[in-house]
Structure formats: C-alpha cells, structure tokens
Amino acid sequence: MLFDYFKQGINLGGFLSQYEIVTDANSEDVLIQHFETFITEENIAQIAAWGFDHVRIPVDGFLFFDQKAGRLCDKPLEYLDRCINWCARYGINVVIDLHNIEGHIFGEMDTPTPLMTSPVLRDDFCLFWLRMAEHFKEYDKTKLMFELFNEIADATGYLWNSLYKRAIKEIRKIDITRWILAGTNYVNSVGYLDRLDLVDDPYVFYNFHYYEPNVFTHQNAHFSEEFCIYKSAQAYPGDMTDYIRFLNEHDHFRKEHPLMNSETTCNDKELMQTLLADADKFVNYSGCELYCGEFGVIDTAPTDDALKWIRDFVTLCNSLKIGHAMWNYKCLDFEIIDINNQVVRPEILALLQELNR
C-alpha cells in the first residue's frame, strides 16, 4: 500500500527547515525572499519530470508553531500549502516531516532531552500535530503523509515510544485515516527498529534513515567535528579497518556509530545487506510497512563510488518494497541542484532518473 504511493522521492531540505544554512535568517526581508523563491512551481515540475513520485518537506517547529497561542503560524503554512498545491498539480505526493522543534537536541543520547522530559514541550509537540491534522483533514490520505519527527534522540529508550503514540492519538481525534510515519530512536537508525512499540493502526507506518557508514556518506563534511578530524578518503567498496581503529581511539565518536564494530572491515554491498537485514526482518515479522525518509552521499565523496552506493541502496530498498527519499534536492552539501537551480551532480541525477523508470 505505502510503496505504491511513496516509492521514489527526494527531500526539499533547506526550504522550510534548515533555511538558516542557505540564507540570512536574521533579516526578515531576506528570509521572506528565501521562502518565496527557494522552491517554486518550476522546481516541482522538474522533480516530476525526473520521475519522482513524492517529495519529503522538512518543516521547522520553531517557524510553524506559535507556542503561546497554541496554533500554527499563518505565513509559513501559506508557503507549505502553496508547495503542496504545486505537488498536486504535477502528481507528486508529499511527506510533511517535522524536522525540529523546541526541546530537541540532535544526537543527544547521554541525557534525556527537554522534549522528552518537559510536560509543556511534550504537550506542544502533540498540539502541533493536532493542528496539522485539523488543517489537512480534507487532503487525500494517499497524497499527504505526516512524519512525526525527523531524527529523534531519546536517551531513555522509552519516552519516545510514549510520546509518538500520544501524538498519534491526537491526530486520530481529527483524522482517523491519515497516513502517519513514526521513526526509530538514535536518529532514525535502522538498527533500532526492534525497539519501537508498534501501534495497532493500519495507517501507521515506520521509517528509518540510512547513511551507513557515515565515514563514507559524510566524508570530509565541514559540519562534522568527527570528519574534520578524520579526513581519509573513503571508497565504495572500500576498506574500513583504519576508520574502525580511529573509532576505537576516540570513544566520544565511537558511541555515535552503534552499528559499526570491530568486524566492520569493509564498506560494500554485503555490509549494506547486513544492516538492511534489520529492515527486512521488521517487515516480515511485524507485518508493517517501512519507509526510508533520507539517504544520500555528500558531494565531497568520489562520484563513481557515490553512484555505486546509491544504486545498491535503491535496488535493495526496491527489492524489499521500501519507499525512499533521497537527501537532498537543493543545497545542503548533498544536493542535485545548487542555489541558482543549476544541476551540479549530473551523474547522480542520471542514475536517479534511470532508477525511477
């Protein structure tokens, strides 16, 4: 069911979330110009022409939710509605992904975050989704799906299970058939699927992100402390023994990669199959459908190797009937087009078009 409508997508990161990375968020005029021009109808038409069937739109809770008033903010909602209307015009389905909200701390797995522990922030999280359900109640469930949160970090291992189920109950007060995605702990790790408490709801699906191993997909990432230190070029397929040695010598980085261990000696399709076996088991044993909301390779990786990795991942996902959305369409270091709407990774675009056929 899910795979039929959300098979091959691409992310619109940088539009309504992480916009501060691509524009001056301190200038109201500049920010308005960004929202008006970063994603246009022409961009959506292009995405459709490339053969994608959906987009994932990250939205920022700081931008969209007025905590004092307990309501969604009009202007950001207007930008989102406009984009969704363009998508409908070109036959593109939509995932609305709550990418960030007050109280969340990305990757914080040592201490419970305020989002997990504060009653006020937990209430706000659930109220955000209640308001979204109210706003989009009449929209076709097969055309628009809610993703409860982007990459959750819950040091307790159980508070997220409680919070996400509560958010679903709020949505169901308004819309009993809206399709909903609930992601795994530890920044949507595929290895944490077995720690999700599942709900008895035919319209709730589960999702993960896949960038394994990060040393390949994020190599030389300027935004990563780890990969500003470890700068060794990584191939696919490629040897990983030196990187595993590095992790063993840097415990604060080691704990950020729970799926990597001393036996992870080679970055290849076999490793990918091993890690995705958790997804395969989840689908087979739970009877629930899965979706991968993000995957991709940074633009500093060797192009030929990035092509091999992407081909292997998409092929494996398709064989498991797991829909997927590549990160990212525009800007943010993983892009297909740049800020000027010029294609900057033509080889990867050509591969995606081939895989989309």
Indicate where each model-derived feature is located:
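Acidic/histidine-rich helix-loop elements
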Residues: 13-39, 68-72, 110, 114-119, ...
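An active-site-proximal structural segment forming one wall of the substrate-binding cleft
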Residues: 34-55, 65, 69-100, 107-145, ...
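Acidic-and-aromatic substrate-binding clefts and catalytic sites of carbohydrate-active enzymes
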Residues: 33-38, 63-65, 71-74, 152-158, ...
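N-terminal carbohydrate-binding accessory modules
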Residues: 1-54, 282
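Catalytic domains of carbohydrate-active enzymes, especially glycoside hydrolases
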Residues: 38-60, 278-285, 314-316, 320-325
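Aromatic-rich peripheral "rim/lid" segments of glycoside hydrolase catalytic domains that contact
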Residues: 301-357
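Active-site region of glycoside hydrolase catalytic domains
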Residues: 3-6, 116-266, 273-298, 315, ...
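Short, solvent-exposed turn/loop segments enriched in Gly/Ser/Thr/Pro and often Arg
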Residues: 58-60, 98-105, 184-186, 325-333
